[in-house]
A protein has these predicted regions:
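Metal-centered catalytic cores of metalloenzymes
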Residues: 2-4, 69, 73, 163-166
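Extended, charge-rich, solvent-exposed interface segments
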Residues: 2-59
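A ubiquitous short alpha-helical element
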Residues: 10-15, 66-68, 124-128
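Active-site flanking loop/helix segments enriched in acidic
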Residues: 54-75, 118-123
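Divalent metal-dependent catalytic cores for phosphoryl transfer on phosphate-bearing substrates
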Residues: 64, 85-175
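A Trp-anchored, charged/polar loop motif used as the substrate-binding/catalytic surface
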Residues: 82
């Protein structure tokens, strides 16, 4: 008989360990949340802490991109790197808003998709009816309410999640 295998031993995986990417993103959100006047990054920290197990294994899609175990984490990790690069170029950007929006932009996929231990994704009823933009925006609004966070920056964060597909043809809720 062969060795005992787990889902971690099989299938496609991102080139970096999911735990490493998760900790990198959460550490960055915590750093932002520790700054005076921080608001939306506190929402990001709470969402990441609450959904750690799913974030570590969820696929980013059923078939479009990063459709494998840990694919969502890898996608977000790479987008965070791109956002950090934008902050180096455009000093007018708000680091807390941009990085929190990137960290949370696809968080609704945790309810839009059901991902098995191998990383195979299928759409949930909620996902088919609402989509991850609406689901993610709602998750953020509920977490912010629970934390007592409100204000314009929260509205901007919610807008980023609702608008991140850019145009209606790609499924954006607002532009």
């Amino acid at each position: 008989h062969g060795p005992d295998l787990s889902p971690d031993d099989c299938g496609r995986h991102p080139p970096l360990r999911e735990e490493v990417m998760y900790e990198h993103i959460l550490d960055r959100l915590r750093e932002l949340a520790s700054e005076e006047g921080a608001t939306v990054s506190r929402v990001g920290v709470a969402v990441y802490e609450e959904h750690k197990d799913a974030l570590l294994r969820w696929s980013a899609a059923k078939g479009m991109h990063h459709n494998h175990r840990g694919g969502l984490m890898f996608h977000i990790y790479r987008m965070m790197g791109a956002a950090e690069g934008m902050l180096d170029v455009y000093d007018s950007l708000d680091p807390e808003l941009l990085l929190t929006a990137v960290a949370l932009h696809d968080i609704g996929k945790l309810a839009e998709l059901d991902t098995d231990d191998m990383g195979t994704a299928s759409y949930t009823v909620e996902g088919q009816l609402l989509g991850h933009l609406a689901i993610g925006e709602d998750m953020v609004a509920q977490t912010a309410a629970r934390l007592g966070i409100e204000g314009e920056k929260l509205l901007l964060l919610r807008h980023c999640l609702a608008a991140h597909h850019g145009i209606p043809e790609y499924g954006t809720i607002v532009t």
